[in-house]
Every structure is written in C-alpha cells, then in structure tokens.
UniProtKB/Swiss-Prot annotation:
This is Putative pre-16S rRNA nuclease. Its EC number is 3.1.-.-. SUPFAM superfamilies: Ribonuclease H-like (SSF53098). It is an enzyme of class 3 (hydrolase). InterPro entries: RNaseH-like_sf, YqgF, YqgF/RNaseH-like_dom, YqgF/RNaseH-like_dom_sf. The keyword Cell wall biogenesis/degradation does not apply.
Length: 137
C-alpha cells in the first residue's frame, strides 16, 4: 500500500511517497503550480498515483497556531476535495503546522546550502507531513 504525501503551496506542491509497507516517507519531487491560471498539478499527481499504485493521499492542512483554519487552509481543503473527486481515492487532511520549519531544520542540520534548501524545502515538508501521518498509524 503506497501513500502519497502533498505539501500544497501557492506556487508549488511538494510530493513525498511512502515505501510499500507504509513505514517511511521519501521525497519525490516538487510540482510547479499556478493558482491564478487554475493549474494545480492534478495531471502530474494523477500520473504518480498510477505509476506507484497509490491507495491513499495525505494533504497537509495548514492550521493557525490556535487550531483555526485560515484562507490557506481552506484552499488546501478545496485542493484535497478536487483530488478526491478526480482520482476517486481516499484523501486525508493532516495537520502540517510547523512542517516547513521542521524540514528547514533537518536540511540545516544536514549542512545543505541555502540555495539547495530553497529547491527541496517543499519536497521535504511533504516528507515531514507524510512521515507524521505514517507514524500515527
């Protein structure tokens, strides 16, 4: 059973994939999107779902620190609903508070350069989100 993890931003979607046992998450890629033009990366996500035989998708839900959901969280919920309807798969929302900060700390501790961090931060945030979900099971 493979699970896809997504960190949805305004310009990119970070993508992570679980191993076949559903124990560990690995960064896969970063998909460029354009919300204003209605390009959300659904075609590429659909390709990945087919390629890896994905059973479930976990989408990060950016909550405010007080637990409320703001405009970005609402946009992620709509993204998840669109994915659910398009792919007919289970899509789970997962609290992603501080996932980007955690990813940044991981990359800094691994001595990754600032330039390289900028290129992989969304993918790493997706790993943090997906690994959090996997660890909860």
């Amino acid at each position: 059973m493979r699970i896809l993890g997504l960190d949805v931003g305004t310009k990119t979607v970070g993508v992570a994939m679980s191993d076949e046992m559903g124990w560990t998450a690995q960064g896969l890629e970063t998909i460029r999107i354009n919300e204003e033009r209605g390009h959300f990366g659904f075609d590429r996500i659909s390709e990945l779902v087919k390629q890896y035989n994905v059973d479930k998708i976990v989408v990060g839900l950016p909550k405010n620190m007080n637990g409320t959901i703001g405009p970005r969280g609402e946009a992620c919920q709509q993204f998840a609903e669109n994915l659910r309807n398009l792919l007919q798969l289970e899509v789970v929302m997962w609290d992603e508070r501080l996932s980007t900060m955690a990813a940044e700390r991981l990359l800094i501790s691994a001595d990754v350069s600032r330039k390289k961090r900028k290129q992989v931060i969304d993918k790493m945030a997706a790993v943090v989100i997906l690994q959090g979900f996997l660890d909860s099971k």
